Amino acid sequence: MNKLYSLFLFLFIQLSIKYYNAKVTVDTVCKKGFLIQMSGHLECKCENDLVLVNEETCEEKVLKCDETTVNKPCGDFSKCIKIDGSPISYACKCNPGYDMVNNVCILNECKNVTCGNGKCILDTSNPVKTGVCSCNIGKVPNADDKNKCSKDGETKCSLKCLKENETCKAVDGIYKCDCKDGFIMDNESSTCTAFSVYNILNLSLIFVLFSVCFFIM
């Protein structure tokens, strides 16, 4: 029993150290985005059509690199740069510490890491920078398969879902704070409101009025 307890305590401490040393923590406020959790890390996800300029900040993405968009974000962890030459040209380049792989900027340490049902992250608990797999919720690294995300396993949600009528949910392989069952997000107030029969009737009434106005016109 003592050996089992010691092993559990060791794993708990290692996981705590990893989350503590990470740039994104449970207390991070994502600018124009929201916090998510996978098996081994936390990260910010951007709202629609925005991209990450750093671990905590999302901004609007430019669609083309030219003289008017130099230093503007053109993708996650990338920006437009000017290339001197004849003629002068412009390109989308990854931020320092990242490399372009299949048109996506990934950490230098992750170029040769394949995770499967997850993604490669920087192992912040290791003094030597290495890439490790953080898995989709429901999967964990498999020591018998080069630590790829090929093993079923559970990960406890550590997100602080503090808004009223909000809870932690597993959605598409990640944990995120979402409205409880029976509630829906009100985009104007950014709060979870009850999705009652009253709401449905209001929507139906709006649809009927719109249809009547359309046919009258």
From Swiss-Prot:
For the EGF-like domain, which residue ranges apply?
30-59, 61-106, 106-150, 153-193
Q: What is this protein called?
A: 25 kDa ookinete surface antigen
Annotated keywords: Cell membrane, Disulfide bond, EGF-like domain, Glycoprotein, GPI-anchor, Lipoprotein, Malaria, Membrane, Repeat, Signal
**Which Cys-Cys disulphide bridges does the record give?**
C65-C80, C74-C92, C94-C105, C110-C120, C115-C133, C135-C149, C157-C168, C161-C177, C179-C192
This chain is glycosylated at N112, N165, N187, N202
Q: Where is the lipid attached (GPI-anchor amidated serine)?
A: S196
Task: Tell me the lineage of the source organism.
Answer: Eukaryota, Sar, Alveolata, Apicomplexa, Aconoidasida
The record's PROSITE patterns line, in alphabetical order, gives: EGF_2
InterPro entries reported in the protein's UniProt record: EGF-like_dom, Pvs25/Psv28_EGF
The record's annotation in Pfam families points to: Plasmod_Pvs28
Q: Which organism is it from?
A: Plasmodium reichenowi
Q: Where is the signal peptide?
A: 1-16
